[in-house]
Amino acid sequence: MANGNGTGAEVDAAPAINAMVQYTKDFSFENPNAPRSLGPQDKPPNIQIQVNVNAKQVAENDFEVNILLEGSAKTDADTLFKFELDYAGLFRLINIPQSDAHPVIMIECPRLLFPFARQIIADAVRSGGFPPLYIDPIDFAALYRQRMSQVAANEQAPTVA
């Protein structure tokens, strides 16, 4: 009989994600037109950011999850800066059914990593002489749905022999 305080077997069976370690796998920041690009600009730069999430299983319940962020800030004439960040974490899934593992890995794990990746980019852009770039929060659930729709569409597309 449970004692109502959330201890015992029911806690042991609770689903959980353990972030075992987080790390920068690869990072690049380029400031190709400094110091000329560091002066006042006539208008705000065009900022483009691409996001991708990858994961691979490294042990029975352990997964390495990567957020890949690539971006640039450009004016009509110049590139102000460019960056590429591959930020990863090693996650252990506990008591998560196999049927739920893929969305947990591709949505929840990146959601846990994102604030740290965002801060790395903000600090690098600031250190490059620009105001910090705070990337807007990313809807990893929408990104996951979009990716799954693309996979489904590719599987249904006829192949050319």
UniProtKB/Swiss-Prot annotation:
Keywords: Chaperone, Cytoplasm, Protein transport, Translocation, Transport. One of its GO terms (cellular component) is cytoplasm. It is found in: Cytoplasm. SUPFAM superfamilies: SecB-like (SSF54611). Its main location: cytoplasm. It comes from the Bacteria. The keyword Cytoplasm applies. GO terms for biological process: protein folding; protein tetramerization; protein transport. One of its GO terms (molecular function) is unfolded protein binding. Homotetramer, a dimer of dimers. One homotetramer interacts with 1 SecA dimer. Belongs to the SecB family. PANTHER family: PROTEIN-EXPORT PROTEIN SECB (PTHR36918:SF1), PTHR36918. One of the proteins required for the normal export of preproteins out of the cell cytoplasm. It is a molecular chaperone that binds to a subset of precursor proteins, maintaining them in a translocation-competent state. It also specifically binds to its receptor SecA. This is Protein-export protein SecB. It comes from Methylocella silvestris (strain DSM 15510 / CIP 108128 / LMG 27833 / NCIMB 13906 / BL2). The lineage of its organism: Bacteria, Pseudomonadati, Pseudomonadota, Alphaproteobacteria, Hyphomicrobiales.
